[in-house]
Amino acid sequence: MVKNLLVELGLEEMPAYVVTPSMKQLRDKMGAFLTDHRLTFEKIEMFSTPRRLAVRVVGLADKQSDLTEDFKGPSKKIALDADGNFTKAAEGFVRGKGLTVEDITFREIKGEEYVYVTKEEIGRPVEEIIPAVTEVLQALTFPVSMHWANNTFEYIRPVHTLTVLLDEQAFDLDFLDIKSGRTSRGHRFLGQETEIASADSYEDDLRAQFVIASPLERGDMIVDQIQALEEEHGVSIEIDEDLLNEVLNLVEYPTAFLGNFDAKYLEVPEEVLVTSMKEHQRYFVVRDSEGKLLPHFISVRNGNAEHLENVIKGNEKVLVARLEDGEFFWREDQKLAIADLVEKLNNVTFHEKIGSLAEHMERTGKIAALLAQEAGLDADETADLARAAAIYKFDLLTGMVGEFDELQGIMGEKYALLAGENAAVAAAIREHYMPTSADGELPDTKVGAVLALADKLDTILSFFSVGLIPSGSNDPYALRRATQGVVRILDKFGWNIDLAQLLGRLYELKFDSLSYDNQEAVLDFFRARVEKMMDRSIPKDIVTAVLQSTHFVVRDLVETAALLAEKAQEDNFKSAVESLSRVFNLAEKAQGQTAVNPALFENKEEKDLAAAIEKVVLTSDLAANLDQFFALSPVIDAFFDHTMVMAEDEAVRNNRLALLASLTAKAGQIAQFNQINTK
């Protein structure tokens, strides 16, 4: 017979960003716990609010599965003495398994007999296992934790209740400083403590106390209420998924309402208003049918509709204070001169080990000038890039960005346009921050893209140069995001920029403020980011071989890996790769020498291979490039069949190694073929 198990942990209000991950973690750890304890189940349902985490295990077996295990012991010749009696070795073995020598059998393995015992464990009733679920709660991890009262332990927030029910049966367990039972808490203001009758009645019992336990249901309620307000007021409301997910984790009983603000604030840039509403107040933005911002907002109350008019007034008052700040900064910032703000950046620290923001901008400007050539910018674009690089951080010292740091770059563009900068320069100031997340929006303009690349490259190289390199999951300066941004921008614009060569040129640049260092570590860091762009179905050895190539153009690397993975299914792949691998392995002994003297050739096969290598011309057609090298396989094999590479004559030997190295110099731009596993 199956049962349903409810486990609910009641806490003080958790931060919204913690709720959903913690709920999923509880589900996963509970599932692992039950599996480890040989308890089968149909599914695990999840529940959470700001003040609770819960799971309901549906279709839980009423007892553990029986367990039968075979254990191999010592060989028969060790287990029995000369008289055929069990030795101490045999007795010790079975005693350790809780058995006796009477349970011993012998089994033959590869011509020799060994002791075997079979141990059977009858499954225990689920009621005997449930007390251990506190181990699951104790194992939960959180990004932040705290002490409370006189306790020595830490948890995300103080724990008030623990409800553990198997159908209708409540369990009295100890967890941290509380006892479990069937008591739960209702809404902080509208509800009260309540008894949960059974695992199945959980949602209904809490609903009666103004708690909607299911986050999915709360989300649906919020969306339905917003859509009703849309219809009632004839407006269009942006339901931002991230904001919705945050808001539903701020409330236990949601009630959406529409508030208003003075239309005069619409004269402030829309981004300021939207940031004030979404980022600071967690409000949904209201627009008309054409997408124009309206002087309204949608908020969600943690409670019912009683006295809602007071709640609306309170929210309107709070928002107006924010909008007043935005209006003030918008007006005052326009009185500031860009040149004065740029000069003050000399006094703003980028990082104490790296220098000022002004020095960062100077290095970025030099990198941008170099990249302008690589990206093929014309004269006007290059001039716009130089101007943007000279001023692009000025808005960090404006009042608006000081108050709303989410608007950095965005306000820079607006203030630059007001100051008379052209549109390309202004757009680059905004776009240089892109992307702001792993899959965030990328720059649209070439000038903005190059400035973004230059800014990120100096950031990466500077931090690596002073030893501030990400390790494990620790990346306080977001260098992985910056590196991923470089890779994604290069891929989007399809610029044929070889990152390895580019880094080499950057490391030759000289600055008064900093000397770049750790070049190989930076290149490895980029390799790791490019690897994440590749199809996960591509074998690891192929990915490694491609990433170790001497040609480091992002788009080419991704495409080459995919092409090699396709070729791996062809009949000639194994033989071709093995031939090339042999060349790569021997060519390492050439120590970089690729100059070949045809006068030292002693057989036809040497001449044939040299001629074949000479004919290889790499183009932008990556598939054709691969085909050229795979077609060399018979010529390579013939060379090895008739040629002793490591000849006694040093000149002949070195010439043959140089011949092979001349091939790897070309093939190595595709992949390090000896890294590919053909077995």
Curated annotation (Swiss-Prot):
It catalyses: tRNA(Gly) + glycine + ATP = glycyl-tRNA(Gly) + AMP + diphosphate. GO terms for cellular component: cytosol. Its EC number is 6.1.1.14. Keywords: Aminoacyl-tRNA synthetase, ATP-binding, Cytoplasm, Ligase, Nucleotide-binding, Protein biosynthesis. GO terms for molecular function: arginine-tRNA ligase activity; ATP binding; glycine-tRNA ligase activity. Signal peptide: none annotated. It is an enzyme of class 6 (ligase). InterPro entries: DALR_anticod-bd, Gly-tRNA-synth_bsu, Gly-tRNA-synth_heterodimer. It comes from the Bacteria. Its main location: cytoplasm. SUPFAM superfamilies: HD-domain/PDEase-like (SSF109604). It is found in: Cytoplasm. One of its GO terms (biological process) is arginyl-tRNA aminoacylation. Tetramer of two alpha and two beta subunits. HAMAP family: Gly_tRNA_synth_beta (MF_00255). Belongs to the class-II aminoacyl-tRNA synthetase family. This is Glycine--tRNA ligase beta subunit. The lineage of its organism: Bacteria, Bacillati, Bacillota, Bacilli, Lactobacillales.
